[in-house]
């Protein structure tokens, strides 16, 4: 006996029976009863009511619903089409600092303002403590500063240009040149040209003495003329 005949004898008949049983079970399961077909034909609404609507995971549509040509072609090709999902973007309010702005639109640094206010309070407190720890003489000196400053501000000075705007204040009249320049108000030695010194002259004569000698000689000549005239005889 060959090996082929042995295997066919031992294993062949049992496999054929199992295959035939499987085929018979499938055929019996696929054949519908005539009674069920007739009942479904008589009640057309029964089929629609008993169907459960469910979405296919791969295609994302309702089975049995009519599809357009484009969708059916794309599904046949293996392309899954999903509608665009609308996601609502919620504003991220966590860990966001509030921005403060002034009337011009510039950002206001709140921390810097608080630091400035704290430093100002600290400085004012230190100044108050310093004044409290002062002696009577130092406090009297502080009071005198304001009185002295008010005295100087109330005083009217001749060289103040702002006095020209207020005509009600009593200002000492000062000599003014034809060109509008202020002249020296005190006494000064004259010169042969008749030029007066400026208002800022300190009164010190810094010339070489020629003007003084010239005026002295002019006086001597005038006196000699007078003497000659008086000593002359009348005829």
Swiss-Prot record:
The keyword Cytoplasm applies. Pfam families: Bud13 (PF09736). One of its GO terms (biological process) is maintenance of RNA location. Residues 28-46, 69-78 have a biased composition (Polar residues). Residues 1-15 have a biased composition (Basic and acidic residues). Associated with the spliceosome. This is Pre-mRNA-splicing factor CWC26. It comes from Candida glabrata (strain ATCC 2001 / BCRC 20586 / JCM 3761 / NBRC 0622 / NRRL Y-65 / CBS 138) (Yeast). The gene is CWC26.
């Amino acid at each position: 006996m060959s090996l082929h005949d042995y295997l066919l004898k031992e294993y062949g008949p049992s496999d054929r029976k199992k295959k035939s049983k499987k085929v018979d079970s499938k055929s019996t399961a696929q054949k519908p009863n005539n009674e069920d077909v007739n009942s479904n034909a008589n009640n057309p609404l029964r089929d629609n009511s008993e169907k459960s609507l469910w979405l296919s995971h791969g295609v994302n549509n309702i089975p049995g619903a009519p599809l357009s040509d484009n969708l059916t072609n794309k599904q046949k090709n293996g392309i899954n089409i999903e509608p665009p999902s609308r996601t609502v973007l919620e504003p991220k309010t966590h860990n966001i600092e509030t921005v403060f702005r002034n009337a011009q639109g510039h950002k206001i640094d709140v921390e810097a303002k608080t630091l400035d206010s704290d430093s100002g309070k600290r400085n004012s407190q230190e100044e108050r403590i310093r004044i409290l720890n002062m002696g009577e003489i130092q406090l009297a000196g502080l009071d005198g500063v304001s009185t002295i400053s008010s005295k100087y501000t109330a005083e009217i000075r001749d060289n103040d240009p702002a006095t020209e705007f207020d005509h009600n204040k009593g200002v000492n009249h000062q000599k003014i040149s034809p060109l509008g320049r202020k002249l020296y108000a005190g006494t000064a030695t004259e010169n042969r040209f008749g030029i007066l010194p400026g208002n800022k002259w300190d009164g010190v004569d810094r010339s070489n003495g020629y003007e003084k000698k010239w005026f002295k000689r002019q006086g001597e000549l005038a006196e000699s003329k007078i003497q000659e005239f008086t000593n002359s005889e009348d005829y």
